Amino acid sequence: MSSENTAIIPIVMPKWGLSMTEGTLNEWLVEVGDTIEVGQAIMDVETDKIASMVEAPDAGLLRRKVAEEGELYDVKALLGVLADDLVSEEEIDAYIEQFESTVGDEEEEVEEALRSQYIELSTGTIRYVHRDGEGTPLLFIHGFGGDLDNWLFNLEVSANPVYALDLPGHGQSTKALNGDPIECLSQTISEFVSAKNISQCHLVGHSMGGLLAAKFAIENPSLAVSLTLLSPAGLTSKINEDYLVKFSEADSRKAMKTTVSLLFADQSLVNRSMVDDLLKYKRLDGVEEALHTLREAMSNNGQQTINLVEQLQNLVLPITVIWGQQDQIVPFTPEVEDLSLGTHIRIELLPDVGHMPQMEAVDKVNEVLKQLS
């Protein structure tokens, strides 16, 4: 951006995840003349992966909408302008004319830093991403049927080093699970941490990944600095086994969309591209068997087979549990409140959020992640 007018703040097309290069502005949620607050939903954007509301990173008066609804724009393209009343229309016109997309070198550096990499472990070939930073690293662990792209809204918010990986049976990693499936995934995490010479880390886990993060911390207390668990397995008795079965067996767009919609309180987040990507993943050799094996290891007649509550209560490190009140996969139940008996454990129950708080409550989750040092 070449303009030096600091009284003008641009609203740009956000970048979510490694592969996003453009997005469609579906709808403006604010009007010219509105005073925008930080965190306020200002527009709805759709990519080839997901549709989501965009929250304002800056506060100010919306003076101009540059982008039109229904149009496709490059990442970092100028969509709107915030400026106070003292800024003239002529200054805004000049700013818009001079604005330069910041995709360029800065964006290339980010993409380079977060490009997919691969490492050979005893459990197979593992895909991961890494970004340098200052402080204790954050290690992100996805859930059942997911991959590291589930963290597309969260990987770049912390100034700390960041790692995220595709577990065996998922994403672009090896599909075979050797031996006990949960132990195979646990071993993968342990070997990855060792291979990357990570002496300590903040563990961030979602669903099955929350169970794995907690298990790692329990078994390696000297390596874990904190736990951030999103809709985690392993803390309650119930699990939606019907979802696990249907996800494992879905082989059509209709079946997959119906199933995946259960993940979200706002089902409009599920778009055609998301469904197509999941079906492509499901059709890879070894995936169906891996999911079936994991499903059987985690659940039995709608009951979870692993419960780590007592061990977490005895663990001496900060634990934040974030749960969607509308979670239909691992529903929040009163028994979770037993966790709060430990003074080191904080529980955040979010209204109007389903099983994917990292996508449905981005601001809240990222606020927690930014506090990790």
Where are these regions (language model features)?
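Short beta-strand/loop motif that positions the catalytic acidic residue
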Residues: L315, V321-W323, D327
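Conserved HGGG/HGGXW glycine-rich cap/lid loop of the alpha/beta-hydrolase fold
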Residues: H130-Q172
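Conserved alpha/beta-hydrolase catalytic His-Asp/Glu region
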Residues: R253-Q313
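Short alpha-helix in the alpha/beta-hydrolase fold that links the catalytic acid
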Residues: L308, P331-L339
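Active-site loop/oxyanion-hole signature of alpha/beta-hydrolase fold enzymes
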Residues: Y163-M208, L212, E367
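Flexible "cap/lid" loop of the alpha/beta hydrolase fold
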Residues: A214, I218, A224-M256
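Acidic catalytic loop of the alpha/beta-hydrolase fold
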Residues: G302, Q326-V330
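Mobile cofactor-carrier "swinging-arm" domains
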Residues: M1-R115
